[in-house]
């Protein structure tokens, strides 16, 4: 389908004598103006510089046209602007704003890398390098909040939660997951909440096969996060929240050894229903009166 182009738009304002005219007929035009803000944020955080330092460039130096940092920036900013497929590189090669995000002159700068170059770059990254990349992202997030809160936090809550990432095709390690009723990956997502703030901050994601158990990779991730968080916030208490898929003596032992407060969901059973009988009746009455879902909290002793 042909693209409909608007060559000119005129804006009339009540309190202005002259109209404002916007024209779109320049050769160096782009639809991704938000990329400039992302570039400014990256300049402040120096994130892509740090990520590039995690990668080893094994290419012949005499044949390099695009540095590792340039390739990384091109891919990251492209993804952030909605260009998931490396095939988009062909039409973005001379986009002025995408060249600007890489650090090139938006008009006279050299064209960006092609799809084959980006594909070779992605496939050359080793598992060890991927670990270093994830660790660098997590440390950048922690350092940002350490600066924001001046290293002072009374309580930090770590939420660990598996989620589905549906797949479409023959990607490696994609499996059918009965709980989500789809073929997918099952990444483990970690977020941080500081003190009584309502915002949850993404700090790490571990990509896993679609049939992974909920706890797969969680122990190592939790230990790494606690190590860095305790160094950044030495006076903080820690709370870990996980759902029922983590319930089990092995995981509870890990939480005890890490000396953290924890909240673990449990699958319903006859004994728990009996213990919660009075509270369930109270919640039912409140819900019937209000017409909304109501939450009632209580405590009990329970040993499986």
Please describe what each predicted stretch is.
Residues 59, 107-108, 136, 236, ...:
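Residue-level signal for alpha-helical context at structural boundaries
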Residues 228-229, 234-242:
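A conserved hydrophobic secondary-structure block that centers on an alpha-helix together
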């Amino acid at each position: 389908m042909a693209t409909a182009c608007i060559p000119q738009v005129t804006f009339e304002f009540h309190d202005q004598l002259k109209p404002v005219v916007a024209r779109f007929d320049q050769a160096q035009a782009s639809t991704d103006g938000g990329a400039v803000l992302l570039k400014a944020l990256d300049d402040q955080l120096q994130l892509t510089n740090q990520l590039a330092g995690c990668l080893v460039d094994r290419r012949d130096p005499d044949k390099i046209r695009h540095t590792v940092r340039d390739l990384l920036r091109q891919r990251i900013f492209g993804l952030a602007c909605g260009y998931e497929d490396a095939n988009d590189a062909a039409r973005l090669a001379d986009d002025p704003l995408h060249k600007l995000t890489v650090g090139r002159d938006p008009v006279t700068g050299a064209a960006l890398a092609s799809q084959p170059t980006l594909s070779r770059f992605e496939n050359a990254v080793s598992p060890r390098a991927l670990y270093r990349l994830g660790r660098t992202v997590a440390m950048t997030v922690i350092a940002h909040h350490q600066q924001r809160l001046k290293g002072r936090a009374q309580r930090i809550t770590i939420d660990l939660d598996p989620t589905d990432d549906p797949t479409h095709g023959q990607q490696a390690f994609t499996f059918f997951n009965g709980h989500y009723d789809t073929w997918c990956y099952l990444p483990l997502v970690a977020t941080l909440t500081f003190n009584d703030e309502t915002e949850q901050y993404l700090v790490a994601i571990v990509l896993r096969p679609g049939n992974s158990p909920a706890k797969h990779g969680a122990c190592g991730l939790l230990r790494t996060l606690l190590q860095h968080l305790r160094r950044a916030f030495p006076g903080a208490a820690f709370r870990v929240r996980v759902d029922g898929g983590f319930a089990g003596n092995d995981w509870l032992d890990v939480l005890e050894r890490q000396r953290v407060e924890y909240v673990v969901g449990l699958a319903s059973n006859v004994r728990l229903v009996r213990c919660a009988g009075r509270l369930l009746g109270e919640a039912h009455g409140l819900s019937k009166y209000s017409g909304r879902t109501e939450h009632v909290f209580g405590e009990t002793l329970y040993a499986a």
